[in-house]
Amino acid sequence: MAISDLLNRRVRAAPDEDEEVYSDESASGSEPPSDEGSSDESGSESGRDSLNGSDNDFDSESQNSEASDSISEDEDDDGDVKSSLNNISFGALAKAQASFAPQTKRRTKNLKDNEGTTASPLDDIRAKIQEAREQKRKASLASKDSSAKSRVDKPPPRTSKHAPTVQSSKYAVSRKRTIIEPPSVPKSRDPRFDPTIVGGRGGSGSSAPSDAYAFLDDYRAAELRALKEQLAKTKDVRRREALQREIRSMTDRLRTIENHKREKEILSEHKKREKQLIREGKKATPYFLKKSDIKKQALLKKYEGMKSKDRAKALERRRKKAAAKERKEMPMERRGLGGDSDAAPSKRRRMA
């Protein structure tokens, strides 16, 4: 049987089986009368009920026979349909299914048509309320999504400025790779922070850098001698003044370097003495020298190493320096050397 014949075949619906209704009266009529002395009216009524019951039984039997015939015919048709469907390809079934419109679309269209015909102001208000709720729900979802994204993108704030910064580890792997290593460029080394000099020999407070670069002092001394010789040979006034300034600055630099060396020596000797006293048990805690004490001891050590003539010159120079400092701190009226009190105070000359 072809698929077109199967689709165009008319099928008769099977009639529903009516439930057999048996009334109490028919049931009582079928039963034999219990009271023999009943009246004639009761006998006639029972006869009518029995006739009605027999008619109902005949009708039910006829309906049952028709239903059984229709069921048998349907079973035969179903068998033929199944045998023919087994021989149909899936492509033909798909085409047949696509030719029919889905029932859901039909139902929705019918419902929309019914709603359009029975529209009322109350329905419009309900629809507007529903739309407002839907918009509010979408806005809340969008705000939640944006807040979640901002929380993900923005790292949490630090507890304090000393706390380590939080950085995400989700970084793409770099697609660049070094094929040829560039040649190593020699870097300039600072002796103050060079680990080969400072770090390897007792830390930053040690005298390792000064010992390693002690030859610079010899260079400075040689340069100072060359400048003095050049000053003796030069007759130009401007050139002589420039050489004198340079010699003065260099001597001051050398004097400062010597003072620093002297202070370091004093501090190292003091530390050794304190460690020895603690080791012997004479002291429990060390005594740390103040900067003023270190400077005083360095000055005493400097004067002890000088000759008597040089020491006198140095003391005189130091006295003049202290007097000039005190004079600057005095008020203008007391800076004179003992003249008339009515005389006008001497004004300080400005240096150009």
Swiss-Prot record:
Coiled coil: 221-280
UniProt-annotated location(s): Nucleus, Nucleolus
Keywords per UniProt: Coiled coil, Nucleus, Ribonucleoprotein, Ribosome biogenesis, rRNA processing
Disordered: annotated segments: 1-209, 303-352
Recorded superkingdom: Eukaryota
Family: Belongs to the RRP36 family.
Entry function: Component of the 90S pre-ribosome involved in the maturation of rRNAs. Required for early cleavages of the pre-RNAs in the 40S ribosomal subunit maturation pathway.
Name this polypeptide is given: rRNA biogenesis protein rrp36
Protein's gene: rrp36
